[in-house]
Amino acid sequence: MGPYLSQPKTEKTSVTGQNQVLQYAATHMQGWRNTMEDAHISDLNIEPDVHLFAVFDGHGGSEVAIFAERHFREELMKNKNYQQKNYEKALTETFFKIDKMLQEPSGLDELNKIRGVTDEASLAGCTANVALIVGKTLYVANAGDSRSFLNRDGKPFDMSKDHKPDDEQEKKRIERAGGFVSDGRVNGNLSLSRALGDLEYKKDNRFKPEEQIITALPDVKVTQLSAADKFLLMGCDGVFETWDHQQILNFINSELKNTQNLQKAAEKLLDQLLAKDTSLGTGCDNMTCILIQFK
């Protein structure tokens, strides 16, 4: 059996919410893939005027994405730097804390229970694109190739960059740690160079966590939100295979102008991006997006 179904699963699971400062719609669709491996967080007011959103795109199984979805908020809020309002450092430390938890017996046991087997959980991983909104400050921490961008005055303002093995700095780290890049893949296998999980690439005790073949180290980008910022779109890589950011932005603007409905706009976006068939390979992945509109 190949990676694709004979017909796509186009049913969507969506959640919405709003408060005084923003409203959001989060939606996901399995699409052509045999399994659904994405997970996400959409959490208003984890404390007053602090909001948390995240996209986790799993590979090799859904268990690491589900684990991150379950534990990220709690671990972030327990973090001392978070409590001291050092949010950039807190986000980075929480990425590494999730990775550490995955390697502990209790974490491995939870992965196995999610997966339903006892021998392959360490092969799974996930991207992590996490947005923390604190008042008018937006922090986006990213490891992997999920993305976030703002609609800033009608133009996309990227809040993350993809971590790909062919990138010069990524390739240097991979090779220093004893790995190699072949056909744009780490050790000929993984098409991204930073992720949560993927524990088999993180076993060399000679190297720090940020120096391993695959690292959970996120880039953290910070910006001040203003009236120029209309919405933030977050998504797994499947959302960004077909259209560029400007095309996606224009589509969402048009839909919101017509419907004023975030959920309908997000769901219709996924329908537009879904491939008609699997011949080209693009538009065939699981798709998850979170659309956050600022009031």
UniProtKB/Swiss-Prot annotation:
Give the PPM-type phosphatase domain ranges: 23-294
Q: Which Gene3D superfamilies match?
A: PPM-type phosphatase domain
Q: Which GO terms describe its cellular component?
A: membrane
Which Pfam family is an annotated match for this chain, by its short name?
Answer: PP2C
Annotated residues that bind Mn(2+) 1 are located at D57, G58
Which UniProt keywords are listed? Hydrolase, Magnesium, Manganese, Membrane, Metal-binding, Protein phosphatase
Q: Where would you say this protein principally sits, based on its record? A: membrane
Q: Which InterPro entries match?
A: PP2C, PP2C_BS, PPM-type-like_dom_sf, PPM-type_phosphatase-like_dom
UniProt membrane topology term: Peripheral membrane protein
Q: Where in the cell is it found?
A: Membrane
Might you give the EC number(s) for this enzyme?
3.1.3.16
EC class (word):
hydrolase
One annotated GO biological process: signal transduction
**Reaction it catalyzes:** O-phospho-L-seryl-[protein] + H2O = L-seryl-[protein] + phosphate; O-phospho-L-threonyl-[protein] + H2O = L-threonyl-[protein] + phosphate
Instruction: Give the protein's biological function.
Output: Enzyme with a broad specificity.
Official protein name in the record: Probable protein phosphatase 2C 6
Query: What organism, scientifically named, is this protein from?
Result: Paramecium tetraurelia
Task: Please spell out the taxonomic lineage of the organism that makes this protein.
Answer: Eukaryota, Sar, Alveolata, Ciliophora, Intramacronucleata
